[in-house]
Amino acid sequence: MNNFGDFLRKEISKNKLSQNKFAEKIGVSSYYVGQLIKGEKRPPSREVQLKIVDALDFNESKKIQFFDLIAKEKSDIPSDIYNGVMKNEEKWNEVREVLNKGEKNND
């Protein structure tokens, strides 16, 4: 099992959902959900991630944990950060400034 798959399986179970019912709620096949849980498929697209967050009614802390797990497995930016930055081009420069400060501090 993988970290994301374990996390997803536990959260589906906590919400007392069957794999079929969960798949229906997020608009995918139960086979696909099974593949995610077993680690046979990489974590889902940003669109499906948001559907999972809604379907499992994650609080803020659980959302962060969820997005961070996926980002680590995909070597990607967490979806909540990506979506927040992409909605506002002014944030792009703020992110660059923070990253540049970090690079200068590491020198």
Spans of features found by a protein language model:
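Recognition helix of helix-turn-helix/homeodomain-like DNA-binding domains
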Residues: 27-43, 51, 69
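A short, Lys/Arg-rich alpha-helix, primarily the initiator
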Residues: 1-17, 96-98
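Short, charged recognition helix plus adjacent turn
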Residues: 62-100
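DNA major-groove recognition helix of helix-turn-helix/homeodomain DNA-binding modules
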Residues: 47-64
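DNA major-groove recognition helix of helix-turn-helix
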Residues: 12, 37, 48
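Short alpha-helical "recognition helix" segments of helix-turn-helix
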Residues: 21-23
